[in-house]
UniProtKB/Swiss-Prot annotation:
Entry similarity comment: Belongs to the phosphoglycerate mutase family. BPG-dependent PGAM subfamily.
Recorded name of the encoding gene: gpmA
HAMAP family attached to this UniProt entry: PGAM_GpmA (MF_01039)
Subunit description: Homodimer.
PROSITE patterns per the UniProt record, alphabetical: PG_MUTASE
Described function: Catalyzes the interconversion of 2-phosphoglycerate and 3-phosphoglycerate.
Pathway field: Carbohydrate degradation; glycolysis; pyruvate from D-glyceraldehyde 3-phosphate: step 3/5
An annotated Gene Ontology molecular function: phosphoglycerate mutase activity
EC number from the UniProt entry: 5.4.2.11
Record's protein name: 2,3-bisphosphoglycerate-dependent phosphoglycerate mutase
Residue numbers annotated as active site: H9 (tele-phosphohistidine intermediate), E87 (proton donor/acceptor)
Intrachain S-S bonds: none
Length: 248
C-alpha cells in the first residue's frame, strides 16, 4: 500500500480579505503559518515521513511546505516546484472581494465561477498587470500555457500530465510523497483519484493547512482517505470555505 499526503496552503493574506487569488502571489498570514506548522506536527505525531515533496511556484504553497518540513525535520528532502500545481486562474475576478462580487452578480453566479467544473470567470485582457505571462516563474512557457482565466476543467487538464508523468511514477517507485498546493489544484487531483463526477465536484471544498491522507493500492486506486486533526474543527473550516462566495 502507498500513502500520499495532500495539503492546501495555510491561510493567505487574500484568504483573510476574502479575495479571489488564483495566480497572484500573495503570502501567508500568521494564522496561515500556524496552520501549516500544525499540519506538520500532525503528520509527525502520526508517524509520517517523506522522501519527496511537490509544490507550486506560488509562495503561499512553498512557504506552507517549508513549515511542514521544518516541523518534521525534513527540510533536506528533494522538492519539485511545478507551475502545474498552481491554483486555478481566476481571470478578471483576481483581487476582487468574493462577498462584494456575490452582491453584484448574485450568490449563484459566483458559486458557478468558484466551483463549477467547466465555466471559467471572465478572462483578463492580455497584458493586464495580473497577467503572469513573461513572469520569470513561467519562462519558456508559450502564451497558451499561461492562462488568462481557467475553470476547474482547465486546471485538471494541466495537473493530470504532472500526475501521470512524475507524481504517480514516483509513488509507484516507493517514494513517500507530500504535495503542498492549492484548493483547486488539490480538487483536481481528488476529482481524478476518487472519480468524482463533474456535477458532484461543485460540493467539494478543501480546508487550509489540513493534511489529507490517501491510502492507495498498487495501481494507485484509493483504498480510503481521511483528514488528520480535530474532525469538528475540520468541518467548521470546510463550512467557512463553502461560505466565502456568498453576499453578506
Amino acid at each position: 500500500m502507498h500513502k500520499l499526503v495532500l495539503i492546501r496552503h495555510g491561510e493567505s493574506t487574500w484568504n483573510l480579505e476574502n479575495r479571489f487569488t488564483g495566480w497572484v502571489d500573495v503570502d501567508l498570514t500568521d494564522t496561515g503559518i500556524a496552520q501549516a506548522r500544525q499540519g506538520g506536527r500532525l503528520l509527525r505525531e502520526a508517524g509520517f515521513t517523506f522522501d519527496l515533496a511537490y509544490t507550486s511556484v506560488l509562495k503561499r504553497a512553498i512557504r506552507t511546505l517549508w513549515h511542514v518540513q521544518d516541523e518534521m525535520d525534513l527540510m533536506w528532502i528533494p522538492t519539485r516546484t511545478e507551475w502545474r500545481l498552481n491554483e486555478r486562474h481566476y481571470g478578471g475576478l483576481s483581487g476582487l472581494n468574493k462577498a462584494e462580487t456575490a452582491a453584484q452578480y448574485g450568490d449563484q453566479q459566483v458559486l458557478v465561477w468558484r466551483r463549477s467544473y467547466d465555466t471559467p470567470p471572465p478572462a483578463l485582457e492580455a497584458g493586464d498587470e495580473r497577467d503572469a505571462y513573461g513572469n520569470p516563474r513561467y519562462a519558456g512557457l508559450p502564451r497558451e500555457q499561461v492562462p488568462l482565466t481557467e475553470c476547474l476543467k482547465d486546471t485538471v487538464a494541466r495537473v493530470l500530465p504532472l500526475w501521470e508523468t512524475s507524481i504517480a511514477p514516483d509513488i509507484k517507485s516507493g517514494k513517500r510523497v507530500v504535495i503542498a498546493a492549492h484548493g483547486n489544484s488539490i480538487r483536481a487531483l481528488v476529482k481524478y483519484l476518487d472519480n468524482i463526477s463533474d456535477d458532484d465536484i461543485v460540493g467539494l471544498n478543501i480546508p487550509n493547512g489540513t493534511p489529507l491522507v490517501y491510502e492507495l493500492d498498487a495501481n494507485l486506486k484509493p483504498i480510503r482517505h481521511y483528514y488528520l486533526g480535530d474532525q469538528e474543527a475540520i468541518a467548521a473550516s470546510l463550512a467557512a470555505v463553502a461560505g466565502q462566495g456568498k453576499a453578506k
